[in-house]
Amino acid sequence: MKKSSFIILSTLFSASVMAQSWPTQTAESKAGTRWWWLGSAVDKENLKWNLHEYAKHGIGAVEITPLYGVQGNEKNNIPYLSDKWMEMLRYTEEQAERNGIELDMSTGTGWPFGGPWVSLKESACRAVFVEKAISGNTLIDITPAEKDAKNAFLHKVMLYAADGTATDVTQQAKSNQLVLQEAQRGAYKVIAIFIKYGVMKVKRAAPGGEGLVIDHFDRRAVANYLKHIEQAFERTKTPYPHTFFNDSYEVADATWTPSLLEEFEKRRGYKLEEHLPELIAYEPKVLSDYRETLGDLLLENFTNQWTAWAHSHGAITRNQAHGSPANLIDCYAAVDIPEIEGFGLSNFGIKGLREDPGKTRKNDSDFSMLKYAPSAAHICGKKFTSSETFTWLTEHFRTSLSQLKPDIDLMFCAGVNHMFFHGTCYSPKEDEWPGWKFYASIDMSPTNTIWRDAPFFMDYVTRCQSFLQWGEPDNDFLVYLPVRDMWKKNINKLLMQFSIHAMGQLAPEFIQSILAIEKAGYDCDYISDKLLAKVSVKGQQLITEAGTHYKAIIIPSGTTITPELKRVLERLSPYVIYGEDTQKMAHFAQPEEMKTSCGLKLIRRRNANGYHYFIANLTANDVEEDVKLAVPFKDAKWFNPLNGEITDADIDDDGIEVNLRSGESMILQVFNTPLKESENACCSNEDKQDEIEIDNSWTLSFIEETPHIDKTYQLDKLQTWESLDEKTRTVMGTGVYTTSFELKKKQLDANWYIDLGDVRESARVYINGQFIGCAWAVPFILDTKGTLKAGRNELRVEVTNLPANRISELDRQGVKWRKMEEINVVDINYQKTLYDQWKPVKSGLASKVRLIYK
């Protein structure tokens, strides 16, 4: 192989090779965060301070979501959409602009959309079926059961004869009593439909936002809801936000809407009311048609209307479609920024990554789930795919920066390029620690100890997203989403919600298809019937209406081919693959050996100069292999998103050397033409050296700590501090480890890295007074960057721990810090609990520190 130097390119590049530099950073390439306003009890001084802190630490967008308040703080609560609330919003907009932060807001408080201005008849509703045998009676009582009777209104009464005929007898029902005519006594069954309104109230609502959830399927209900919000903006002359947000669809009891029967007949070509026995019995065809109709209404009356409304006011929409009883691809495609969600912590077995048994929950968003929103974005030419990121990774106060990286890397590989933390609570600067908290948050805020080194994580995200937002998607295949096969499934209820937590049950066959395609070395995007109808063949490829190219479309095994789908596929022939046929896949596209040989996760994008990859080693193995790429190239560069370094790649023909330790990630850019040689480039002739263990005595002191510790500790060997004494057992903050070591002149010929081993939880490192970087993710290894010298070298390592030991001490002392209203603070299983029994969490340097040759 051609050996190229691994040196940062510090010279300015000419215009012809500017692609070798990092893409321009924007507010969108920075991390965003969901910003909870508890009780909307905000004030201008603290808004200004909070936004400045966020900007200083690298946050580029905030999304205001008002929630319930703080106990004893009721006098400071500000009712949602009141003149005072709108004044605070205007001030926030001004301060956000000054700090270079984009301002988004939820289109309501808590979730889902709703409030006190939603009338009963425009609220979410469900069908109550009253089924009675006739048995020769002429008077039938069709009164709903007591539990269903409140707010239930008679909608339709149908009579069913033994020969299958159905008769509408609604007009014969009075006061829940059905009077049959003599000729009708031969029928065997009557089914009455009542519509029960008000089946859900806004969850976690803020003051002024309490009330009924809207009927998402009803156009007028949605329009009236949005009109009320619009009036507040117009009344107060407040500028609209950059983006309106909608959280995942969680109206589990909404199975009906007043126009459903009419809309069903219009769309499906027959009357649903004539087939209620089949619907109640979950007969596949009727059930599927019912579910498809609800999906159509949600898309048209809610998603499309909401987006059009936002556009009419100069704003855009960001939407979580998951949970919807609709084709997710169509719902994601209907908005400006589709958003997926992570829920829990993935376990990849990465070497050296902290584990916390019993204090984490499994990630329900596997790789196949994460690809729904990016698929819609790619197919429709949308620049951004966002994510609700790090929801419920661990118990409160126990989430480290190192635990964040694998899951954000997985999201990046799925196609996410505009992440939002879940999230950040507005908290007054002077509020006693731990301040205001939201129960399902990693707490990316100034009140968390990880905030000190969070800018280094933010830099990582920004560098990754700047590349992932650049260029165009380059996935190999489209994959048909067989949603009608899913709709036919009997899950013992009418409504089928495609939620993160349910996909394993609803779509196991589809998930296996996606994993098989991934294992074969390819990448794909999911497509719906609606979007597939607009795909054409051009230049021996499939091209979407937005201009995105694919090699072929894969029809997953077991998919029902309807006549309509058959006609579309015939038009796209021969670029159709039935089943997970890897030989046919290889006929259309080259697999990526980084996937098949190394087990790496990656995503590839096209740009004007070639291609670029984001690559993550989410395995327990270190990878050092020569691999062939699936795309042609003449030259290549590695971009390290952890530290910003740009280095030459070792290449040979269409192959490249890949070196990634367990947990590491890199960006690879390959070019269509050879690059000019850098004046700084030279081949390395360094001799490999043995590692050097820094095993001298250490000193340990503390900065920015609570409670304050004056003492300096003398350590014969490295150890974490929670076991030193009672004070260190409960301290949160930064411990400063210092030592010195000797090097001989000949040892300086090596390119040394410092390996900190097991860090709890992040560490800033200084050698001879020079800052060399922050180690916040595994492996905790940093380049010494020429700071070493012959003779005595001074080493300073500033380690910041988690606040877990401090909060457990507050619980032992009986401090009332759980002061939020409503759900307050619960554990990962949504149970109220104390942390007083927590064992001390390791804090500091937990293993040997070495100099290694890399």
Predicted regions and their residues:
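Bacterial Sec-dependent N-terminal signal peptides
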Residues: 1-21
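Mature N-terminal segment immediately following signal peptide/propeptide cleavage
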Residues: 20-61
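Carbohydrate-binding surfaces of carbohydrate-active enzymes
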Residues: 31-32, 43, 47-48, 61, ...
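Acidic/aromatic-lined carbohydrate-recognition and catalytic surfaces
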Residues: 67-175, 180-184, 190-203, 209-214
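Extended acidic/polar, glycine-enriched regions
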Residues: 149-152, 156-234, 652-690, 790-792
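Short acidic/polar inter-strand loop motif in beta-rich domains
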Residues: 675-676, 800-809
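Aromatic-lined ligand-binding clefts that engage carbohydrates, nucleic acids, or primary amines
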Residues: 741-768, 775, 795-799
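Short, surface-exposed tryptophan/glycine-enriched loops
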Residues: 782-792, 803, 852
